[in-house]
Swiss-Prot record:
It is a multi-pass membrane protein. Keywords: Membrane, Repeat, Transmembrane, Transmembrane helix. The keyword Membrane applies. GO terms for molecular function: transmembrane transporter activity. This is WAT1-related protein At5g47470. It is found in: Membrane. InterPro entries: EamA_dom, WAT1-related. The lineage of its organism: Eukaryota, Viridiplantae, Streptophyta, Embryophyta, Tracheophyta. The chain crosses the membrane at residues 28-48, 59-79, 93-113, 124-144, 158-178, 197-217, 228-248, 255-275, 293-313, 319-339. Residues 40-172, 219-338 form the EamA domain.
Amino acid sequence: MQFFCVNLYRSVLNLLEERMKTEMIEEMVIVGGLVMVQFVYAGNSLLMSYLMSLGLGPFTIVIFSTFATFIILSPFAILFERKQWPNELSLRLIGKLVLISFAGVTLFQSLFLEGIRLTSPAMATAMPNLAPGLIFFIAWIVGLEKMNLKCVYSKLKILGTLLCVFGALAMSVMHSTSISHKEEDDTPIFVFDRDKVVGCIYLLGAVFVLSTNVVLQASTLAEFPAPISLSAITALLGVLITTVVLLLQNRKTKVLASSLISFGNLVGYSVLAGAVSGACVSFNGWAMKKRGPVFVSMFSPFATVISVAFAVLTLGESVSLGSVGGMVLMFVGLYLVLWAKGKEGFSEIESFESEFDSKKPLLS
């Protein structure tokens, strides 16, 4: 009996070691992919800024690029994920899909673009860095993020999230402040601007909508475990809802608001942006399915780091000491969260080994 228990113990340990190796490789793929996604997002923002500088309206870009995302992702969804589709679409699942589309495409874009118009691009870049903290809080409330305040790893996750948020905000705000001081030395420091206050409220609303939408996506993936299909469906619904909203607002939707860009170039840019966005959203959905919404959101401040680095390398802008300090805080916070979540994942293995310690007799 003792010989059988020893062999069983060793075989289970071997299986656990193989599982740990597989999870380590998967972890490297997820982390590397999420960093690359932020590089792509930063480049996509530059492309969108360039298109708007040519006179294209932001909603025109959103509608074209989102529809291109649907066209590009649909064949892959049918080819690779058809077996994962549910047999029946419940009213609850349909409601979630419509809500994700409305919140992620129409409502978020409306609030975010209005916030940019009333404030500044620098403030709009800083505000989304609040998303990891909000996503952590919302996921905790709805039960998608495991938390035990008596556990040291849970406390480290909270500390790491706060450090990441504060560091990203400090980096972006300090960087934009150093630029504004160079350009506007004679401007008073304390000036109450009603439009900027309202714009900040719009941006906060956009960040809250984005955070809620990310958690809702994670919840929907449990019922609809097909991230590519989910991205394609929500892209199509988002285009339809955005178009209807624009028509209800009696806005004239001009396809070409500027003669600087041809229709063919617009289609080409839209296909490029749609392909990039579709790939990134699908990978984020897969990573969210594997590691949860909080883990994925912790990488979003990387876009700010990339934007600052690009401004320094190409535009010759200087980086203040506060920006460097914020960057250090952000990376420390990110490392704490990754380390704590990894330790939480292997806590079950450690508890198993403690129950079957090889130094203790198996039979008593």
